[in-house]
Amino acid sequence: MKAVGLVVEYNPFHNGHLYHAQTAKLQTGCDTAVAVMSGHFLQRGEPAVVSKWARTKMALQSGVDLVIELPYLYAVQKADIFARGSVSILNELECEALFFGSENGDIKPFLETAQLIDEHKHILNDRIKEELKKGASYPAAAAIAFSSILHTESALDLSKPNNILGYQYVTSILTGGYPMKPYTTARISSDYHDADLPEGENHIASATSIRKAMIGQNLEACLRFLPAASARELAAYRKSFGLWHTPESYFSYLKYSLSTVTARELQQVYEVEEGLEHRIIRSIRKSSSYQEFMELLKTKRYTWTRLQRMNTHILTRTKKQDMQKLLDNDKAPYIRLLGMTKKGQAYLSEKKKALSVPLVSKLSSFSHPALDLDVKASRIYSLPIEEPLRTEFDLQEYGHAPIRYDEDEQHFLNV
């Protein structure tokens, strides 16, 4: 059996993701798709609109064979750390290929750019430091530095979110010396951050536009952009727990957290840098919504995404020293299995004896500081759910066995 790795969030799983999973197998010649998926909080610092279990069920019904959780340690991070953790898991599972979406669908510029940047990394680092001193945000500083050496027509456009992540995946493969071949395909139809559902006959929409419509209480308008399985799981989650999760859902908890912490304590939280703790405390006192808080907090130096990640770390009280200690390791400390098809189970049985890190199926069987972070993030995620459903949700984190799906008979075996 041969596997292709996918790094995903599935927030939610839509037709573009279905195309991605199908094309990954076709273009690479692999028969098994392994998805490393962010858990309850995502790379941009947002909560997933529905739980990782609901999103796993969507994926297993739509061509993905194994779903592995990307630990919080890597999931709520800037692109290079996010990619490093994801790729290390795919390598541990002996994926022969990594497949990702990009703007143009050509892998050559990614490989050339990675080599060029590696050759000029000292110049780049110096230029980034210069731009940061001028007050630029890190992404803006990096973009200026990259443009100073990437000045050919064939150079990779690193202003595009998918290209940035793709570049980091390729860099992680090369830096790690992993025997994994990167492939890419062009994104189809909808732009990554399109805020509105497209009109006409198009059946591909951005996850951003789908979430916006869902949160506006209009799931029906999203149906043509979703596989039937995703529509079912979204409706079932809403019926079971009574909400879609949004950043605004957590504002009262964030405000409480910031009302009970000192500036000195806040300064110890991961990604709270350079005196930002004072601005945070001043801004939260004046804010009556998450949107208002973010608008007061945002500056030229700190992007919305960076601040959202910081807010999530405040909610989870993740400290700099704890995170840094965990990040000192080059690879993920465990593999947390969320779900599998029959084919995925066969692939895992073939590979698990060679794993150099523990395979975690149930939390009761394993303990690790990084896993403690995952559990804490899950408990924070459940806060907007009303009791007694919240306690029921929290207990799932410990008692939920990996979801098993029979792709031949098209039904779940244990849910």
From Swiss-Prot:
Annotated phenotype, changing K362A: Strong decrease in activity. Decreases tRNA binding
Q: What does changing S206A do?
A: Decrease in activity
Q: Which SUPFAM superfamilies does the entry mention?
A: Nucleotidylyl transferase
Phenotype of gene-disrupted mutants? Deletion mutant lacks the ac(4)C34 modification and displays a cold-sensitive phenotype.
Q: Name one GO cellular component term.
A: cytoplasm
Please write the reaction equations for the catalytic activity of this protein. cytidine(34) in elongator tRNA(Met) + acetate + ATP = N(4)-acetylcytidine(34) in elongator tRNA(Met) + AMP + diphosphate
Subcellular localization, as worded in the UniProt entry: Cytoplasm
The answer, when asked if Cell inner membrane is one of the entry's keywords, is: no
InterPro entries according to UniProt: Rossmann-like_a/b/a_fold, tRNA(Met)_cyd_acetate_ligase
Summarize the impact of Y256E: Cannot form a dimer and has no activity
Q: Which UniProt keywords apply?
A: ATP-binding, Cytoplasm, Ligase, Nucleotide-binding, RNA-binding, tRNA processing, tRNA-binding
Positions with a binding annotation for ATP: 7-20, 101, 162, 187-188
Against Gene3D superfamilies, the record matches this protein to: HUPs (3.40.50.620)
Per UniProt, the enzyme's principal EC class comes to: ligase
> Which biological process, per GO, is one annotated for this protein?
tRNA modification
What does the UniProt record report as the effect of altering H14A in this chain?
Strong decrease in activity
Write out the transmembrane intervals: none
**Role this protein plays:** Catalyzes the formation of N(4)-acetylcytidine (ac(4)C) at the wobble position of elongator tRNA(Met), using acetate and ATP as substrates. First activates an acetate ion to form acetyladenylate (Ac-AMP) and then transfers the acetyl group to tRNA to form ac(4)C34.
User: NCBIfam families of this UniProt entry?
Assistant: PRK13670.1
Q: What quaternary arrangement does the UniProt entry report?
A: Homodimer.
Family according to the record: Belongs to the TmcAL family.
Q: What is this protein called?
A: tRNA(Met) cytidine acetate ligase
Q: Which organism is it from?
A: Bacillus subtilis (strain 168)
Q: Which gene encodes it?
A: tmcAL
